Amino acid sequence: MQDLPAGQAQQPFLTRSFFFFQYHFRESDDANASNRSPVSNPYEPDYDQLSPPPMLGAQRPVPEQNESSRDLLHSSYHGSIGQASYDQGSFNGHNSTYGVGGFGHYPPDLHGRLPGSPGYEYPEPEYDVEASRLAESRLSVMHRTPTMQEWSPNGETLSVSPDFAHGRPDSTYQEFDVDESWMMRQQQAQIGGGGLGRSKTRKVKLVQGSVLSIDYPVPSAVKNAIEPRYRNGPGSMEEEFTKMRYTAATCDPNDFTLRNGFNLRPRMYNRHTELLIAITYYNEDKVLLARTLHYTMKNIQDIVNLKRSKFWNKGGPAWQKIVVCLVFDGLDKVDKNVFDVLATVGVYQDGVLKKDVNGKETVAHIFEYTSQISVTPDQQLVRPDPDKPHRNLPPVQFIFCLKQKNSKKINSHRWLFNAFGRILNPEVAILIDAGTKPGPRALLSLWEGFYNDRDLGGACGEIHVMLGKGGKMLLNPLVAVQNFEYKISNVLDKPLESAFGYVSVLPGAFSAYRFRAIMGRPLEQYFHGDHTLSKTLGKKGIDGMNIFKKNMFLAEDRILCFELVAKASQKWHLSYIKASKGETDVPEGASEFIGQRRRWLNGSFAMSLYSLMHFGRMYGSGHNVVRLFFLHIQFVYNLLNVLFSWFSLAAFYLTTTIIMKLVGTPQVLSGYHGWPFGDMASPIVNVLIKYIYIAFLVLQFVLALGNRPKGAQYTYVLSFMVFGLIQLYLLVLTGYLVYRAFTGTPIEDQISFASGQAFFDSFFGGNTGVAGLIIIALITIYGLNYIASFLYLDPWHMFHSFPQYLVLMSTYINILMVYAFNNWHDVSWGTKGSDAAEALPSANIVKDEKGKEAVVEEIEQEQEDIDSKFEKVVWRALAPMSEMMEEKPEAKDVEDSYKSFRTGLVILWLLCNIVLITFVTTDDFSSLGVSKASDVRTPMYFRFLLYSTGVLSIVRFIGFLWFIGRTGIMCCIARR
């Protein structure tokens, strides 16, 4: 956030691959800098002894240089006293000068020009070029410089990065294994990280003789970034800005208590935590993590900068009431590059982790620090600018929980709620998945919902799809389809459920709960899905569950929502908050899309049945009569949706075949001809399309039973294309039917206004009720979506995403649901051991000098060594990210009973849909006393289908209108 001098901001940096930036912090004139020595490292090359990286080919282009840019190579960028500064330095930490050898060991060229000067011609290589490529890529970490930033007039960050004489390398770790490098760095402190023989040891007393909690000095860069107004402000503690606290938790989350010797800084400082923001992480890259982390800090800035708040401006600084907790699910799955981002922020350091304490395995590594530094998704460093304090990010209290083993998201939430939540006792806990980008004031809007409604137990904001610059992602039909799905859910589904008081799912990617509302039974039922509790819970745990309940925990968020609303003697309700917006990316490929929806569809279907079967628990809650009445309406609404979903496979097949028959083979008495290929060709084409439809539907069952989506991704792409083309053909035929219905017979002749009964019969029923049926279908299926989207003030998805959704609509059933139901048995649980943890050092307990108290000997590093290591951390953190390697699928070990249940479910599903198809399309059912004519049953079925869909759409629209009206009123009277 610090402005650069004019010349430095505009002129390019000239640098050679043998020169790199050093990150210096000058609290004095640095007069003793000449006495410094480089820090040796047994796992990294000695940069002083290395030859310059060879040139790859002919002469290198050198950026044009003038006196201004040359001066930058000899001078440091100085901030105010105590603030961070960037220097161009040589390997011993001092500014280098021009001359022979200034750029490696290159001599002046034939014209007497020095290396680095304009027009300098580098000599041709005299050694094997191919053999030198590896050396250059290994040294690419030296080519990187921290990307600095400055504020533009509108407050955005601008990249100010140097140019490279050798060209900008693709990645810091292009050929060097990131995981291996990270594991090596964990051992450095144990073998003398200083490398100068000057490292000291200190004895750290264990809390209650068993809890290892150590304070580590942070790099000067990090602690000097804290503004004096915060460092010396009310309620601030010096150690939270100068020391990072590390705790090795060797216990279960339920045992992380004050009684057992564990504590957290906010409580140690007697601070009230109003807002606990949890970011759950699995294996996302550093760009996704930086996106969530940076915009979370921007949201905290929105809260701190409030001027007229009746709450946040009382009882201490606002930033002291907010805690950000990052929970990482296991060491092995972590992209090790994210540790560099966290280390740059100050909440992590290499060489600190302990795999066990006196032989007792560490379950979670917990770091605590309060920082004012951030890294943007574009790898720009953001730090305070003393000249523009109103634009600076406020201090943020961080808790970083790194679980040693991968134990799933539910276990991460158990650390959040049962461990940290019980100590901090927050009023509201906000859950965000790594990769989700909170919009401006999104977290504030979520909190205001709880502040203004004392009975609000949970809430969620609007999640919309990242569309890229200029909406370029919409060119991918799968992204456009998901964008429409997200949007229409935000416009119609969530407002309706919010009106009833029970939102069926608060997405874990962006939701919030009142902490005291979910305490007790809601969390107890929710944590039954944590496999680390399976032995403790016995039959109630995940190992004792049948496959149906295990599938429920694929949609664990829905369990928490139902348990919260049905909580005994309580009247908590759930709500959707329109003003709170978050942005997330969605699967772009067919295989990823199918894999994601398998979990969603199976989990939501199982949980929908569970909520319907246990609806009676609502009578034991504290809801009033009015709320219970609307919950009953929602019960009927959800029941109809489940039934329609169950028979949707038959519904799509019947719709496709019958419309093709009506258009291609019209009745002779109607006077119409086969369309669009004539009386002879249209029936033949329609029969071929029907066979292709059936063949690809059967193919989906074969693929779902025997292949993973990644192993048959091209076949799935072809399936999406085929079903999409058939659906497009069907839409054309439907448009022709609508045109024929309104042009063949005038509308006034089809609808009678002679009397109310005549109007009702002609519009809704009888043989002449076609026009009314079509009008209802057009209004409810298309019209209400457009009207609601315009009233919502967000109609654009109806234009750029709705067409793709109409074309690919059938694939949601024919591909996604078929795959999901055929993989109902696919539920994998259990912990995965951590290979990365084996590289971590142990903490061995010894007695103190008096032979009484238990202590741990810890190497104490000099501040200069910490700062030197931090320079490399910043380079790695701000380096462009290389492409991630594809994850290897885990081996599955599924019981035969799960597959048997899956087989029975699929057979029952197919049987029900086949019976419906047969009943509608077969002529002779005389033995059952049913009319012989299928042409009588078919219109009846479609009338029922369209009228039912219309009623459900009208209910959604009424709920939407109520939500919009209530939201508008609440905006006028809400407290802030």
UniProtKB/Swiss-Prot annotation:
Q: Which residues cross the membrane?
A: 639-659, 684-704, 717-737, 773-793, 801-821, 903-923, 944-964
What catalytic reaction does the record list? Answer: [(1->4)-N-acetyl-beta-D-glucosaminyl](n) + UDP-N-acetyl-alpha-D-glucosamine = [(1->4)-N-acetyl-beta-D-glucosaminyl](n+1) + UDP + H(+)
- Pfam families documented for this protein: Chitin_synth_1 (PF01644), Chitin_synth_1N (PF08407)
Which terms are listed as keywords in the entry?
Cell membrane, Cell wall biogenesis/degradation, Glycoprotein, Glycosyltransferase, Membrane, Transferase, Transmembrane, Transmembrane helix, Virulence
Q: Which GO terms describe its molecular function?
A: chitin synthase activity
Task: List all Polar residues biased stretches.
Answer: 31-40
Domain of life, per lineage: Eukaryota
Homology family: Belongs to the chitin synthase family. Class III subfamily.
The name of this protein is: Chitin synthase 3A
Q: Which gene encodes it?
A: CHS3A
